[in-house]
């Protein structure tokens, strides 16, 4: 494949990610036996990729991916992207909060015979969970004392309170 072919296939596939009715076509760019690296668990192949993205879209129905940079060389494409969405369904065990997220990610693709045959995914899940208020960083910095864990944002506190109220109202 030429650089232009790879660029077109990659651009088209990631544009499909944002089309509610065309999301299934996102997977057309991938080989059935695509090797996946960096995804949670032991996901492999097109079925694993599909399961990951369908869970993401269920949790964040308005998820939008914007390719910020695309570099193509040889049989590889490197993407720097921004992923945004609103938490409307369960995500990695976290019930919906109604909060939004905005993260950047990196992906490296290897293509052959007109399909993505290997993908290296730089995980964004922890950054998303932090923005949803589900996890907190309490990491010591070099030369500094360990700090108290950060408090949840006002929006995260409000969402947690709403969730607790809904759970209390449920039978």
Predicted stretch roles:
Residues 1-171:
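C-terminal and inter-domain tail/linker signature
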């Amino acid at each position: 494949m030429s650089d232009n072919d790879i660029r077109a296939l990659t651009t088209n596939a990631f544009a499909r990610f944002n089309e509610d009715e065309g999301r299934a076509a996102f997977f057309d760019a991938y080989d059935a036996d695509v090797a996946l690296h960096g995804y949670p668990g032991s996901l492999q192949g097109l079925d694993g990729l599909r399961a990951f993205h369908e869970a993401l879209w269920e949790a964040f129905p308005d998820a939008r991916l914007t390719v910020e940079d695309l570099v193509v060389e040889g049989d590889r494409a490197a993407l720097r992207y921004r992923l945004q969405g609103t938490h409307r369904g369960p995500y990695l065990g976290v019930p919906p909060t109604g909060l939004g997220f905005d993260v950047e990610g990196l992906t490296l693709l290897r293509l052959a015979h007109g399909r993505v045959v290997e993908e290296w995914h730089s995980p964004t899940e922890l950054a998303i969970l932090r923005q949803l208020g589900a996890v907190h960083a309490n990491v010591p910095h070099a030369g500094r004392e360990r700090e108290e864990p950060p408090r949840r944002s006002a929006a995260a506190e409000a969402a947690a309170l709403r969730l607790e109220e809904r759970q209390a109202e449920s039978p």
